Amino acid sequence: MEPLVTHKGKAAVLNRINVDTDQIIPKQFLKRIERTGYGRFAFFDWRYLADGSPNPDFELNQPIYEGSSILIAGENFGCGSSREHAPWALDDYGFKIVIAPSFADIFHQNCFKNGMLPIRLDYDVWKTFAASYENKGYEMTVDLEKQQIEDHEGNITPFDVDPHWREMLLNGYDEISLTLLLEDDIQAFEDKRSSWLRA
């Protein structure tokens, strides 16, 4: 994965609570195991009308949000089934960071595992961000190293992130590459095993 240290991008607001993974990526599109190609199906039932044309009333279809890479979402984002396709779809859509008051636990972990940064903010702080950025097309800068967000006016907001996941994103590690960093320790342990336990 690519390291994520700082990211500057346009923020889009999807102010809906309890957005579940089936709304993020409907089940009929989960027939592939590749991680790419899901962006066009993200929020499919909201994003398109019955005839396949874009729904002009869907928030993320507003021209002001075109090219957004930061999603300001509502409470309990990513609830529902634990499909990893949900962060795949968001990432392929173009989102690298999701900011919300709360996330479903499995979705929260799946974001980190797929190189995305989910940021939890206290509700009142999140509410200010949502109001400031709704239908504006403003940019913000997220600094994972400093654990802070700089808004379009230069205001700084700190955020917390688990040290383990922070280190993974800063270095671009996935779980396999992190395990390989311990290859010497693993081999040393294996060498100490009794011969009849070795493959």
UniProtKB/Swiss-Prot annotation:
Keywords annotated in UniProt: Amino-acid biosynthesis, Branched-chain amino acid biosynthesis, Leucine biosynthesis, Lyase
Cellular component, GO annotation: 3-isopropylmalate dehydratase complex
Gene3D superfamilies, sorted: Aconitase, domain 4
Catalytic activity: (2R,3S)-3-isopropylmalate = (2S)-2-isopropylmalate
GO biological process: L-leucine biosynthetic process
Iron-sulfur listed as a keyword: no
Sample GO molecular function, one term: 3-isopropylmalate dehydratase activity
Source superkingdom: Bacteria
Cited SUPFAM superfamilies: LeuD/IlvD-like (SSF52016)
A Pfam family: Aconitase_C
Keyword Amino-acid biosynthesis on entry: yes
Sequence similarity: Belongs to the LeuD family. LeuD type 1 subfamily.
Quaternary structure annotation from Swiss-Prot or TrEMBL: Heterodimer of LeuC and LeuD.
Role noted for this protein: Catalyzes the isomerization between 2-isopropylmalate and 3-isopropylmalate, via the formation of 2-isopropylmaleate.
Name of this protein: 3-isopropylmalate dehydratase small subunit
Organism phylogeny: Bacteria, Bacillati, Bacillota, Bacilli, Bacillales
